[in-house]
């Protein structure tokens, strides 16, 4: 499978990892030792919410986000596959639910 560079912009700094196209970005982050927020791991809540600022993801497995939210860049990292090199701002649940 193809792999993409996924950059996570977190409150404690920026980390770039390599994520296979068939791996959720949250799983790849954890395998790389990054500590990102999550809860259900099923795309049904907002704990892992982030904002895509560059690139693209496939998050068809998620159910929580509305179409408009996804079009605005919101992403649930637990159900997002990278479809290009992508940059994601993490720890965004408060902004999403505000």
From Swiss-Prot:
InterPro entries given in the database record: 2Fe-2S_ferredoxin-like_sf, 2Fe-2S_ferredoxin-type, 2Fe2S_fd_BS, Beta-grasp_dom_sf, Fd_pln
Cofactor details (free text): Binds 1 [2Fe-2S] cluster.
PROSITE patterns, alphabetized: 2FE2S_FER_1, 2FE2S_FER_2
This protein's UniProt keywords: 2Fe-2S, Chloroplast, Electron transport, Iron, Iron-sulfur, Metal-binding, Plastid, Transport
Binding site for [2Fe-2S] cluster: 40, 45, 48, 78
Cofactor section: [2Fe-2S] cluster
GO biological process: electron transport chain
GO MF annotation, one: metal ion binding
Gene Ontology annotations for the cellular component aspect, listed alphabetically: chloroplast stroma
Start and end residues of each 2Fe-2S ferredoxin-type domain: 4-94
Principal subcellular localization: plastid
Cell location: Plastid, Chloroplast
UniProt keyword annotation of RNA-binding present: no
Function: Ferredoxins are iron-sulfur proteins that transfer electrons in a wide variety of metabolic reactions.
UniProt family annotation: Belongs to the 2Fe2S plant-type ferredoxin family.
Protein name: Ferredoxin-2
Organism name: Phytolacca americana
Lineage, uppermost ranks: Eukaryota, Viridiplantae, Streptophyta, Embryophyta, Tracheophyta
